[in-house]
């Protein structure tokens, strides 16, 4: 059989199918491919020879070039091409030693593409040098812009902002010329739907205010090595549906008008690395108010660190009446907190548990938890492999013995030096189940067991 010939014909058939597409569609496909690879497509056929020249965007990384001059020359030549359509996308990644020249060139390139009805601006500086690129003010008045993604640059104080179409903003370790720049940008983008901010101590913002009538999704990552009590995030977004906060440095989180919230992921310790003082009433009230604002969610992830702060401060939990899906990351010593938290979720149906070893000496308290019935729980997944040790088995027992309508419990099995898989399975079979219809599905590396 001529398998080589068949492969060539199949390859030609794929090429022909792609070539039969309209040029405008091919150019849109190429928009998501690194521009150097797009240029290489010119050797495919006569039709493809100049097609790359009409791709309405640039996607380029410095490390794709032999040296700095080749990098600059390529970008300059591409931007100099005549185009009938707008310049839709400018994606730039650079990491080079030519600091002064790079700053000048990047600003010049941004000004060029902004004047061509740019829709997507994505600039990432991997240099991490002493001086960053300051984004030119022309970006603030790019009325065609839809998506703005920046990393390791400086945003200047705007005199005028006109960004009526911007829906997505992602800022990663960005500096601001003053503390109000980001607040101005957010409040001026009337179509903003998604906001991601990854912060560091260099951004010089003590109080971050996120006020938006249109915002649907907000993710906040705090990367400050040291926190202080002045750091605060205040959110006022009445249409917000998705909230994701991972931050151990910011001391205060405040929310209002959060009735539209559907899903939240919370990993916060409110700048409380040390054991909090139980009489810190202002801190306790702030945390209680924050929890009350997110209590309308239907889906929630909450970390063991957050649970511990809530527990140690003696915070009163609100009722999460709408919550149907709960994902909890907890350690051995916080199992009691899991039980307490579940009592505040009267309608939860699905529970995912990430169960980790505790470094604390009081981990044995897991064995003495007051009984509590989880009357609505139908599905549970334990993500940590069960090895047969007492604490892991106690988690399984606690759920099975207190869930009257549980339908399925999924867990992974991992044999240990002390116990083989068969011994662990036998122990699982002896655990009483409050639900008569519950199935325990046990996954191990080579098989799956259903303990009916």
UniProtKB/Swiss-Prot annotation:
- The residue stretches assigned to a coiled coil in this entry are none
Give every F-box domain span.
15-65
Superkingdom to which the source organism belongs: Eukaryota
Database matches in InterPro entries: F-box-like_dom_sf, F-box_AtFBL13-like, F-box_dom, FBD, FBL13/AtMIF1-like, LRR_dom_sf, LRR_FXL15/At3g58940/PEG3-like
Q: Which UniProt keywords apply?
A: Leucine-rich repeat, Repeat
Ranges for domain FBD: 361-413
**LRR-type repeats, residues:** 125-152, 174-199, 221-247, 279-304, 327-355
> What is any Pfam family matched here?
FBD
What is the protein name stated in its UniProt record? Putative F-box/FBD/LRR-repeat protein At1g78760
Source organism: Arabidopsis thaliana (Mouse-ear cress)
